[in-house]
């Protein structure tokens, strides 16, 4: 595990958070769902790209909680450091960083990797089991009240 990733995880425990937490299980759920979506839709996107993006997409959460920087902005900056140590092409690195920056947007204008991560991020949540669901700020349309995947 990359040292920067480990350090971010330690800083972002979310022990007092009553809503969905950003855990390794969440990151892997997002990765698996995004990969399933790509296969179902016939989208040609390497699995490694999807998994790397999903594992890093919320890495800026600790900075958001402590400094107030939006986690997508902070995450892209932090991920850039991690990606410099990984064996991806410059185009692949830019695709990952772009998807991290844009993973909160449901727009059709963003690249397909961003769309996959956005949808998987939302679908990964089990709102139907959550005791905090009534207080959640998500709109009813975003909440997952049934099992789909």
Protein language model features and the residues they cover:
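Short coil-to-beta-strand
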Residues: 6-7, 47-52
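Catalytic-site beta-strand/loop segments enriched in glycine and acidic/polar residues
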Residues: 52-61
